[in-house]
Regions:
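Ligand-binding pockets and gating/stacking loops
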Residues: 1-531
Length: 531
């Protein structure tokens, strides 16, 4: 039997991650120890959970907008109480505005659509095209506009993933989006290329483990795979390499590497194994088609944790469906129309009875899912920390209030310091450190049982409050995981500088214009840094 390393086979799924990443890191660690150098740091990751249609902001935000937030503070919150156990590892980022807000007047962004342009610009910070000239149901680009640049996940992945591999993009509940319907699309490989990602748990598990094909692996085949060590997999390659003339130093390095593989690899996997997969509930029997979001969402999050555990991807984005039937939560209707309070797609009219309570139920469920993800990441040790500690795990929301559709005062909650890059245990108001910033007025959206379009700005957050550009926070995240920039501060492959600029504009009023690209407020938010 050939003992030649098949790169195509090994890199097909978990094999590449399990062998290449952990053992290369171990070799570096061993080499560092023998030479008295610092042990290489654990990988840094960006993990994103994205939800649509905003929230009840005055129930989501705490009263304190700048200062320490304790476990008791979170426990007292209406929506974020499930996050209380992780309070000392949380960073609530306040004062942020996302780019390209929709309105009838087009004063804070383009006029295409409250969802299409927001999703297209959210992680790109680029305008969408075509640029609608009016706000109407029949305007150009209402449902199919595309951003003029690629999204953050791809910008990061090409630098921090091995070989510039694509990010892991998980569409919880199934793949959504097409070139004729881009309302919910957030991941763009390029302006003309939607990145669909993965929408089926079984597909993701198969991609990760390489053990599961159309059907389960037989017990004999599985045990055979488990018995193979790394040396078994690459024995012929190793022998061929040993026959190549090399210096004594290289011979010693090669012998040390082989010894290390024998020491560390009773199997070809370390934490990246079936035991940990099973501990996450990721067995072949459990990961089957079907089920509603109550089971699919935590399963997909567990798969994201397994991917992080295996170092299979250092940029992991996941999203819930743009609009879904919420009956499994005991709520009648779909999430989009519930968010509008009217029971339909219109933004004014008679409020549906108990619509505010229904929104709260959905908001609380999202918080429970994020708490599940954070708890799983925090349960696995990585060096002297946990997976969570070595990551920046961020819950982003498409908008602030779901009927006002405002993008200022954006709800953002980060878990994990990403290797002590970020300050945690705090709410930090990057606008002015004001501890009493408004939490918004979402509970006022149905006064006298009506939603009035003329009052939408008042129901959300006044447009001149919490307006600092999200671009700068993206610079924080990129710098934290090791993305580099060129001399101009924009992220670029092969760069050597800190990232200080991202996107076309950081002024949302410029998005409907044809103004030259300009970043008015470069740099990251230093207040978010641990030191």
């Amino acid at each position: 039997m050939s003992r030649v390393f098949s790169r195509r086979l090994m890199l097909r799924g978990l094999g590449g991650a399990a062998i290449a990443a952990p053992f290369l890191a171990s070799v570096a660690e061993r080499e560092a120890k023998t030479q008295g150098m610092p042990v290489p740091a654990a990988p840094k990751r960006l993990i994103v959970f994205y939800t649509y249609n905003g929230c009840l902001t005055n129930r989501w935000f705490p009263a304190l907008s700048h200062g320490p937030l304790s476990r008791d503070d979170y426990a007292a919150m209406r929506t974020l109480a499930p996050m209380a156990p992780y309070a000392d590892k949380l960073l609530m980022v306040r004062g942020i505005r996302a780019m390209n807000e929709w309105s009838f007047e087009g004063t804070l962004g383009q006029k295409n659509d409250p969802y299409t342009q927001v999703c297209g610009s959210y992680f790109t910070c680029q305008p969408v095209t075509p640029n609608a000239t009016q706000s109407s149901a029949a305007n150009d680009g209402k449902f199919d506009a595309r951003p003029t640049g690629r999204s953050l996940d791809h910008v990061c992945a090409e630098q921090v993933n091995a070989g510039g591999a694509a990010p892991l993009f998980i569409q919880i509940g199934g793949v959504q989006g097409s070139f004729t319907l881009t309302q919910s699309v957030i991941s763009w490989l390029s302006p003309d290329t939607i990145f669909a990602g993965i929408g089926a748990p079984r597909t993701l598990l198969t991609n990760l483990t390489g053990l599961f094909g159309p059907g389960p692996a037989s017990p004999d085949a599985y045990q055979a795979l488990r018995r193979k060590t790394v040396i078994d997999c690459v024995r012929d390659d190793l022998n061929r390499l040993r026959s190549v003339p090399m210096s004594q130093a290289d011979q010693r390095s090669l012998s040390a590497w082989a010894d290390l593989l024998h020491e560390t690899s009773g199997t070809a996997i370390n934490q990246c194994n079936s035991a940990n997969a099973a501990a996450l509930g990721l067995t072949d029997e459990a990961v089957q088609p079907g089920g509603d979001l109550s089971t699919v969402a935590p399963m997909m999050m567990d798969l994201a944790v397994l991917a992080a555990l295996c170092d299979a991807n250092r940029v992991i984005f996941m999203k819930v469906p743009f609009d879904f039937d919420a009956r499994f939560l005991g709520v009648s209707g779909d999430t989009l129309t519930i968010t509008h309070r009217t029971g339909s797609g219109v933004m004014n009219g008679q409020c549906v009875r108990n619509s505010i309570d229904a929104i709260q139920t959905i908001d609380s469920w999202y918080a429970q899912q994020f708490a599940h993800l954070v708890g799983r990441l925090d349960s696995f040790v990585e060096g002297d920390r946990t997976l969570l500690d070595n990551s920046a795990t961020v819950w982003f929301q498409q908008m602030s209030d779901g009927v006002a559709t405002n993008l200022n005062n954006l709800p953002i909650l980060q878990a994990g310091s990403c290797g002590d890059y970020f300050k945690t245990g705090w709410a930090i108001n990057v606008e002015n450190a004001n501890p009493n910033m408004t939490a918004g007025n979402s509970d006022m959206d149905c006064p006298n049982g009506q939603v009035q379009v003329a009052d939408l700005d008042n129901f959300g957050t006044p447009p001149d409050v919490a307006t600092q550009p999200i671009n700068k926070y993206y610079c924080n995240l990129m710098n934290a995981i090791g993305v580099k920039a060129g001399a101009d501060g924009f992220p670029v492959l092969g760069g050597t500088e800190q990232v200080s600029r991202y996107g076309k504009y950081d002024d949302t009023t410029l998005f409907p214009t044809d103004a030259p690209a300009i970043i008015k407020n470069p740099g990251e938010y230093m207040d978010l840094r641990a030191s």
